[in-house]
A protein has these predicted regions:
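Amphipathic, hydrophobic N-terminal targeting peptides for secretion and organelle import
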Residues: 1-36
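Short alpha-helical linear motifs
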Residues: 8-11, 91-98, 108-112, 147-149
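Short, flexible segments with low predicted structural confidence
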Residues: 17-25, 43-45, 93-94, 120
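Short leucine-rich amphipathic alpha-helices used at interfaces
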Residues: 20, 26-27, 33, 45, ...
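Short alpha-helix boundary/capping segments
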Residues: 38-41, 45, 136, 140
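Core segments of small alpha/beta cavity-forming domains
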Residues: 41-97
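Surface-exposed, charged secondary-structure patches
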Residues: 96-130
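Exposed beta-sheet edge and beta->alpha loop/turn motif
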Residues: 118-163
Length: 163
């Protein structure tokens, strides 16, 4: 009788341990798959999105600069949007109107630097043509590190760093 109780206890304990171990392994494999799919999705989506977003953020005409920049605000995370708006109101808009600046931006290359399920960084190669009231165009090539953050189902620009 004692032997049977001991065997039942050991069998039950082992069953619980096996169940917990298999559940943990299954959860780990599931989460790893979620992470990998999120990374693959970011690598597939963000190069095209960055090529589309960056000209919207950097291109403007002095006559419509407020409208152009306002159209770019939804592309930014709420935190970066506040910083970008402060910079736009303090520097970009007044300078654009004063010097009658027209900026055209073209993305010539994009590469993913790092990608995770909810955040990624891309390198953007951008050519800009800046024309002011002197009507003498200035051509400028830039490299930008663009950090993206996924909020809900949407990738938004979290920060732009010139390199």
């Amino acid at each position: 009788m004692r032997w049977r109780r001991w065997l039942t206890t050991v069998t039950g304990s082992l069953s619980v341990a096996v169940f917990v171990g298999l559940s943990a392994a299954g959860g780990w494999f599931y989460w790893e798959r979620v992470q990998t799919r999120g990374e693959e999705s970011a690598r597939a989506v963000l190069p095209h999105q960055a090529a589309d977003d960056i000209p919207k953020v950097f291109a403007y005409d002095y006559q419509t600069v407020e409208r152009s920049l306002a159209a770019a605000y939804p592309l930014l995370t709420p935190e970066y949007r506040q910083e970008f708006q402060r910079s736009a109101n303090a520097q970009i808009i007044p300078e654009a109107k004063k010097r009658e600046v027209v900026v055209q931006a073209n993305v010539v290359g994009v590469g993913v630097m790092s990608a995770r399920r909810t955040a990624a960084s891309v390198m953007v190669y951008m050519n800009r043509t800046v024309t002011d009231k002197s009507r003498q165009p200035l051509y400028d090539g830039s490299r930008l590190r663009v950090d993206y953050k996924k909020i809900g189902k949407q990738w938004l620009i979290a920060y732009i760093t010139p390199i």
